[in-house]
Structure formats: structure tokens, C-alpha cells
Design a protein with these regions (language model features):
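Alpha-helical transmembrane segments of multi-pass membrane transporters/permeases
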Residues: 141, 152-178
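Interhelical loop/hinge segments that connect adjacent transmembrane helices in multipass membrane
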Residues: 1-10, 208-246
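Interfacial transmembrane-helix starts/ends
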Residues: 11-15, 49, 85-100, 104, ...
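Interfacial/gating helices of multi-pass transporter permease domains
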Residues: 36-57, 234-235, 257-277
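Single conserved hydrophobic/aromatic residue that forms the stacking wall/gate
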Residues: 280-288
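Alpha-helical transmembrane segments of multi-pass membrane proteins
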Residues: 125-151
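Hydrophobic alpha-helical transmembrane segments
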Residues: 168-178, 187-213
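Short membrane-interface helical motifs at transmembrane helix boundaries
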Residues: 105-126
Length: 288
């Protein structure tokens, strides 16, 4: 009976996660549609989409894969062999390291924003390039919240909590949609860029009470010369390279799209629709 109850719980959790993911993608499509509805499919929308992908792409290339591929396995290994206290010490060092790395990325990204825009969209007009560079500088701080949110999601999943991580994207998408409806015409594309940072910070903030629920109490720890940190970095090396495919694909897409006016916006929306269709058809196939 106990096994059956556990199986039912897993099934409900999987169903909830699938629905939350699908709903989040649908809201993402609504969010992107509102972008073109309020700002058109031209200078502002292209510049915004380029600027919003630069920080996340850089994050994915540098440390995105480390969290899922190396941090969580090492954390789980410490939990099983050394206990929770030792695992929490590792968490403190890792989170401190993530904050330091993401701060470095933010500062470097803001300083070299023009170079990054040229890499991502080399064929933009001067006006579109300048706007994209300005918006990139505004949105780079979201890398910090991205790193923290990814880390906390991994921790919660290690503790067996999957429902809360699956809804955080819903909250951020709703926050952006709310901006369009209430403030879109008043604060324009610059306000939208600030809202993107706020939306990512909300993902991080929502996770804090749940992290505390499982006994995680963060204390800054700069002792990075730690065998577990070294183990994590050695494990991350080969895996990190494999995570570069999607970010590099995104860069190549935008480089080609920057040749054509509004193409960046159209590609973003078509990719979003493709992902929704893929999720829907894969779920339907699972039912057969």
C-alpha cells in the first residue's frame, strides 16, 4: 500500500510539473506577443530580444551547466557520505562562488556590452545597436539572480521538492505580462528591461522560504580551496562543453537574423511556438 501511495504521489508530481511547464511556455508566448503588440516588430523589439539573450547566453556558456551537471551530484554525494552539516558547508562555499562569478560576469558584461552586441547581432543599424547595448547593460544584473535561482532549484530537487521549482517561471512571466498591461505605455522598453531583472529576482525570492524549510541557512564562505569545490570543477569541465550547443546555436541564429529587419523578433516567437508544440506532442505521445 505504501509503495502504491508513493507511486501515486510521483505521478501527481510529474503531472503537475508537466502542466506547469506547458503553462509557463504558453505564458512566454503571450509575453512575446505583447512585446510586438506594444513595441512592434522592429527596432525596439529586436534590440530588446538581443539584449535579453546576451546575459543568459553568457551565463549558460560560463556556469549554467556546472549547477545541474556538477554541483548537485557532488552535493548529493556529500549528503549521503558526510551528512547534512558538511553538505551545508559546501553549499555556502558554492553559493558564494556563484555570487562572485556572476558579479564578475555582470561587471564585464556592462563594460563590454558593445562588443557583445556586435558578436550577437553584427549587422544592426547604429540606432538599433545603441539601444541593444543600453538594454543589455540594464539587464545584466539578472545573471546574479539566475545563478542563485538555478542553485536553489537544484537544492530543492535534491530534497525531493519539485512542485515549487516548476512554478517559478509562471511567476516571472506573469510579472512581465502585468508590466505590459499596467505600465507598458508609460515606461516603454526601458521599463520592460528593468522588469526583466525584477522577474528573475522574483524567481530567486520565491525559493528562499522553501530553502529555509529544508534547513539551508546561507553564510558567506570564501574558502574556495576545498576538495569538494575542486571535485565539482573537475566534474564540470567536460560536461560544460556539452552545454554550449544551445547557447551557440542561439548566437548563430541571431547573427544571421540581424541581417534582416524584424527577423530576430520573428525567430524568437517561432522558436517559442515550436517548443510549445514539441511539449504538447511529446505529452500526447506518452499517453499512447
Amino acid at each position: 500500500m505504501k509503495g502504491k501511495t508513493s507511486g501515486q504521489k510521483m505521478l501527481l508530481t510529474a503531472g503537475f510539473m508537466a502542466m506547469a511547464t506547458l503553462l509557463s511556455k504558453v505564458l512566454g508566448l503571450v509575453r512575446d506577443s505583447l512585446l510586438t503588440a506594444y513595441f512592434g516588430s522592429g527596432l525596439e523589439s529586436d534590440a530588446f530580444l538581443t539584449a535579453s539573450t546576451i546575459p543568459t547566453t553568457l551565463f549558460d556558456v560560463i556556469i549554467g551547466g556546472v549547477i545541474s551537471a556538477a554541483f548537485i551530484p557532488v552535493f548529493n554525494d556529500i549528503m549521503s557520505k558526510k551528512g547534512k552539516d558538511e553538505a551545508m558547508k559546501f553549499v555556502n562555499k558554492f553559493v558564494t562562488l556563484i555570487v562572485c562569478i556572476t558579479l564578475f560576469i555582470v561587471v564585464g558584461g556592462i563594460i563590454f556590452r558593445d562588443v557583445l552586441v556586435n558578436i550577437q547581432a553584427p549587422n544592426y543599424t547604429a540606432d538599433k545597436h545603441n539601444l541593444a547595448a543600453q538594454l543589455t547593460a540594464i539587464m545584466f544584473p539578472m545573471v546574479i539572480f539566475t545563478g542563485l535561482a538555478f542553485s536553489f532549484v537544484g537544492l530543492l530537487q535534491s530534497f525531493g521538492e519539485y512542485n515549487i521549482p516548476s512554478i517559478i517561471s509562471l511567476v516571472s512571466n506573469l510579472a512581465i505580462i502585468l508590466y505590459y498591461v499596467v505600465f507598458g505605455k508609460k515606461f516603454g522598453i526601458y521599463g520592460l528591461s528593468v522588469t526583466m531583472v525584477i522577474a528573475w529576482s522574483l524567481q530567486f525570492i520565491i525559493l528562499i522560504p522553501w530553502i529555509k524549510k529544508f534547513g539551508v541557512k546561507y553564510r558567506p564562505d570564501f574558502k574556495f580551496k576545498d576538495p569538494y569545490i575542486k571535485q565539482m570543477l573537475l566534474l564540470a569541465g567536460p560536461m560544460l562543453i556539452s552545454t554550449w550547443v544551445q547557447p551557440l546555436y542561439s548566437i548563430v541564429n541571431q547573427r544571421f537574423a540581424s541581417n534582416i529587419d524584424s527577423a530576430v523578433t520573428y525567430i524568437q516567437q517561432s522558436n517559442r511556438l515550436y517548443i510549445i508544440c514539441l511539449l504538447y506532442t511529446s505529452d500526447a505521445a506518452d499517453e499512447l
